[in-house]
């Protein structure tokens, strides 16, 4: 066990990662060494930042806590703290079932952890972070919470109503990250498109993107987690006309069948969804659309699922993720619907949907062979440099594997010609 060392383990989404990075900065300001690697845990203090969104994520968080509890009992770590969405949602149950944890913190009161250790919370460092990502990109959280009332979703239960961060504060944070060498910014929130409605009484995302785009040194801005209902169409010309705003939009649609959209309480119709997607592709030529879909929601019939498959084949999303419905306590669906679709049926539908998407992804990637793209290099591996185009977000999208004919520097941009493609990877060579 290393004295004055803190290990922080982050589970779940990139929004959690930002919270962990801010906590790490506070520990550093108080003289601690911090590490963010689950394979090197030996600190005097270990903090687990949990996810509580759906059953699988909850199970992963609990298993991690139990594993660390065993390490604590063996004397390999000192104090064990838990924070984040799981403990925000199930605090009393966790306190009862996991006595090996020294204290639980929620999603918003984790700042108390510092003072509970007898240390000082530095308010002037509130938005400063220790980056756990490669130094050339960072996630920037522009809001917290959600005002939507989707039937299946526990996020509003955990995080409460939407709270937009002040625009000036976000701009200052980006300037500070640019000064540290960050070039690429993933703008994130549970619902990007709601940004500003609470604080400024208007949809302010287009203005925010313009202001961040104007900052010298910002090479790429990528937008994650838009909501399709009442989409701010003023964003599209910003995306089209500004070179450093990636032609990329991550917008979770969940389904296309009108009966399912109504049961899910999505406040959008099939026709409106098609209109949105067609307008995005028309107004931003070359845009890559990423979406998330759900199968197995209560009430989903075979006809609904077949309609979803036809939709995916028709739209041909460049990027797509999917998951099976999870019956989450406290949600509208939990209170009003029966979780009647067998788990094996959910899994079969999910597997089939992803096989369809794999074929589409293979076609999308194959169409890029022979084209040249501006690529940022993320890292060097044994046989390749690994990079991404503007159409690829870290962790979730395809990467381009670049031959080692020429020495390259991670964090730098290069013109790369695609010479081969697979379903989830491209292969390329740097042009001199």
Curated annotation (Swiss-Prot):
Binds 2 [4Fe-4S] clusters. One cluster is coordinated with 3 cysteines and an exchangeable S-adenosyl-L-methionine. Keywords: 4Fe-4S, Cytoplasm, Iron, Iron-sulfur, Metal-binding, S-adenosyl-L-methionine, Transferase. InterPro entries: Elp3/MiaA/NifB-like_rSAM, Methylthiotransferase, Methylthiotransferase_CS, Methylthiotransferase_N, Methylthiotransferase_N_sf, NA-bd_OB-fold, Ribosomal_uS12_MeSTrfase_RimO, rSAM. The keyword NADP does not apply. [4Fe-4S] cluster 2 binds at residues 146, 150, 153. Residues 4-122 form the MTTase N-terminal domain. It comes from the Bacteria. It is found in: Cytoplasm. Its EC number is 2.8.4.4. Residues 132-363 form the Radical SAM core domain. [4Fe-4S] cluster 1 binds at residues 13, 51, 85. This is Ribosomal protein uS12 methylthiotransferase RimO. Pfam families: Radical_SAM, TRAM_2, UPF0004. It comes from Parabacteroides distasonis (strain ATCC 8503 / DSM 20701 / CIP 104284 / JCM 5825 / NCTC 11152). Its main location: cytoplasm. Belongs to the methylthiotransferase family. RimO subfamily. One of its GO terms (cellular component) is cytosol. It catalyses: L-aspartate(89)-[ribosomal protein uS12]-hydrogen + (sulfur carrier)-SH + AH2 + 2 S-adenosyl-L-methionine = 3-methylsulfanyl-L-aspartate(89)-[ribosomal protein uS12]-hydrogen + (sulfur carrier)-H + 5'-deoxyadenosine + L-methionine + A + S-adenosyl-L-homocysteine + 2 H(+). Residues 366-432 form the TRAM domain. One of its GO terms (molecular function) is aspartic acid methylthiotransferase activity.
